Amino acid sequence: MRTSQYLLATVKETPADAVVTSHQLMLRAGMVRKLASGLYTWLPSGLRVLRKVEQVIREEMDRAGAQEVLMPVVQPMELWEESGRAPAYGPELLRITDRHNNPFCLGPTHEEVITDMVRNELHSYKQLPANFYQIQTKFRDEIRPRFGIMRSREFIMKDAYSFHTNMDSLADTYQIMHRAYCAIFDRLGLDYRPVEADTGAIGGAASHEFHVLAESGEDDIAFSDGSDYAANVELAEALAPTSERPAPGAAIEKVDTPNAKTIEELVTQFNLPIEKTIKTLVVKGAEEGQLVALLVRGDHELNDIKAEKLDAVATPLEFASEEEIRKAVGAGPGSLGPVDLPFTVIADRSVAVMSDFGAGANEDGKHYFNINWERDVALPQIADLRNVVDGDPSPDGSGTLTIKRGIEVGHIFQLGTKYSEALGATVLDENGKSVVMPMGCYGIGVTRVVAAAIEQNNDDRGIIWPEAIAPFQVALVPVNIKKSPRERELAEKLYAELTAMGIEVLFDDREKERLGVKLADTELLGIPHRIVIAERGMDNGVLEYKGRRDADKTEVAMDEIVAFLKEKMGMN
């Protein structure tokens, strides 16, 4: 591609409303342009990357035995009513009507549509297992679209759905798809982790998320330094401490703490080690009108997912209001503790081994110091309630945990029969009996993958694309094509030769741009390989090569440049 005939669309300034690196660089590199809130037009450079991501996904889905289909973006609301999701999905589901006043929606996902297709097309166990995928536009009316294409309203997803006669068959396909996802992200050149994930309200036997590691990620990922264990922090088990609870070292003491309504204030004002304090969090109980107190160490955070799974706690998790707490205890939330608390108390495992700790006295402006279990208050029910932290032992017993931020780019799920049962998707088994088909679903955020790749691969000069998804493989930059016939002739020759070999070349044939601008554009775009053609080098029989990830330039003999590039690109 000649730059003079290409919509390069690079800009020097970073747009003020672009917060994350990927959004900034995609705008500056001319990959996308904002049309409206959460809506983006993909320009040529961005689309080239997007199509390469799609192609890798398509190849691996085909290799995994999935069949490609294409379903409508617009879906009839009657399918959503049949599945029961119409009222539950909320305002993210953009509802529309046609000229005949028939209700439709813009599809945020396609479980209903694919299940409707399958119930009409598959009738016998002999047709199973069956796995279908599409790469299609989705629309979710996000209340606050942000971070560019990372969280937009319109986006492209690869969604696949498998159908089975039993859960064993589903488990087999699930593993095939897990391996396919690993192959996809390996080929895309991303540093990622497949992690155990919460199955949520849908339930199901298993769920894994695929996260690209990046500081801008919205999720915390825990993984072991001694094994392959990895999980979303919300799911990672915090093992019980192996140490014994120390014996009491001091008498319990009630202290006036009028200005200490948070753990941070208590620690600061009374010079307490934060790990010697307890937070008391009150939530609604499973029984109507009941409250439950959850205790975690002062330096730990309550894990809402774990708390919600407790039998005594209401689902969904709901924290008690100050009014409800005062009515039950006679004190505000900032003065609560386990001593004489008049309702069910559940303590985290780490709390159970604490001694001489501080907590609220259930009186406004007062705390107990030097509380000890069994001496001052009975040891309550114990459960895993907290988020894991850096340095915790790995739940699989191998190594310790490291916590890093991750961007979720994929999610695979054993759905079970939620949708197939609701929509009556059945087949006849080998005995002629009608059985509901268990389902699996497997999603990849295609547009989000592009942003995640940038978040992980950039420097102060621009994007550093992994080879597999760069918009161009080679940038060909003559220093002064307007005034140097020799540079033009060699550039044209190399361009023709490389293009004939199937190498994607951006030939910067602009006559009015300075060399500095041309080089800055190639670095901003993240093109992996750059050749600079200069008369001075040609006089010495060399050209200048620089890889996008390289710190230094290399001089390469003119007659060896093609072979050199082929070797760099792994084409030999």
Curated annotation (Swiss-Prot):
<dbReference type="Pfam" id="PF00587">
    <property type="entry name" value="tRNA-synt_2b"/>
</dbReference>
<dbReference type="GO" id="GO:0004827">
    <property type="term" value="F:proline-tRNA ligase activity"/>
</dbReference>
<dbReference type="InterPro" id="IPR036621">
    <property type="entry name" value="Anticodon-bd_dom_sf"/>
</dbReference>
<dbReference type="Pfam" id="PF03129">
    <property type="entry name" value="HGTP_anticodon"/>
</dbReference>
<dbReference type="InterPro" id="IPR050062">
    <property type="entry name" value="Pro-tRNA_synthetase"/>
</dbReference>
<dbReference type="GO" id="GO:0006433">
    <property type="term" value="P:prolyl-tRNA aminoacylation"/>
</dbReference>
<comment type="function">
    <text>Catalyzes the attachment of proline to tRNA(Pro) in a two-step reaction: proline is first activated by ATP to form Pro-AMP and then transferred to the acceptor end of tRNA(Pro). As ProRS can inadvertently accommodate and process non-cognate amino acids such as alanine and cysteine, to avoid such errors it has two additional distinct editing activities against alanine. One activity is designated as 'pretransfer' editing and involves the tRNA(Pro)-independent hydrolysis of activated Ala-AMP.</text>
</comment>
<dbReference type="InterPro" id="IPR007214">
    <property type="entry name" value="YbaK/aa-tRNA-synth-assoc-dom"/>
</dbReference>
<dbReference type="InterPro" id="IPR002316">
    <property type="entry name" value="Pro-tRNA-ligase_IIa"/>
</dbReference>
<keyword id="KW-0436">Ligase</keyword>
<keyword id="KW-0963">Cytoplasm</keyword>
<keyword id="KW-0648">Protein biosynthesis</keyword>
<comment type="subunit">
    <text>Homodimer.</text>
</comment>
<dbReference type="InterPro" id="IPR002314">
    <property type="entry name" value="aa-tRNA-synt_IIb"/>
</dbReference>
<dbReference type="InterPro" id="IPR044140">
    <property type="entry name" value="ProRS_anticodon_short"/>
</dbReference>
<comment type="similarity">
    <text>Belongs to the class-II aminoacyl-tRNA synthetase family. ProS type 1 subfamily.</text>
</comment>
<keyword id="KW-0030">Aminoacyl-tRNA synthetase</keyword>
<dbReference type="InterPro" id="IPR006195">
    <property type="entry name" value="aa-tRNA-synth_II"/>
</dbReference>
<keyword id="KW-0067">ATP-binding</keyword>
<dbReference type="GO" id="GO:0002161">
    <property type="term" value="F:aminoacyl-tRNA deacylase activity"/>
</dbReference>
<dbReference type="InterPro" id="IPR033730">
    <property type="entry name" value="ProRS_core_prok"/>
</dbReference>
<dbReference type="Pfam" id="PF04073">
    <property type="entry name" value="tRNA_edit"/>
</dbReference>
<keyword id="KW-0547">Nucleotide-binding</keyword>
<dbReference type="GO" id="GO:0005829">
    <property type="term" value="C:cytosol"/>
</dbReference>
<dbReference type="InterPro" id="IPR036754">
    <property type="entry name" value="YbaK/aa-tRNA-synt-asso_dom_sf"/>
</dbReference>
<dbReference type="GO" id="GO:0005524">
    <property type="term" value="F:ATP binding"/>
</dbReference>
<dbReference type="InterPro" id="IPR004154">
    <property type="entry name" value="Anticodon-bd"/>
</dbReference>
<protein>
    <recommendedName>
        <fullName>Proline--tRNA ligase</fullName>
        <ecNumber>6.1.1.15</ecNumber>
    </recommendedName>
</protein>
<dbReference type="InterPro" id="IPR045864">
    <property type="entry name" value="aa-tRNA-synth_II/BPL/LPL"/>
</dbReference>
<dbReference type="InterPro" id="IPR023717">
    <property type="entry name" value="Pro-tRNA-Synthase_IIa_type1"/>
</dbReference>
<dbReference type="InterPro" id="IPR004500">
    <property type="entry name" value="Pro-tRNA-synth_IIa_bac-type"/>
</dbReference>
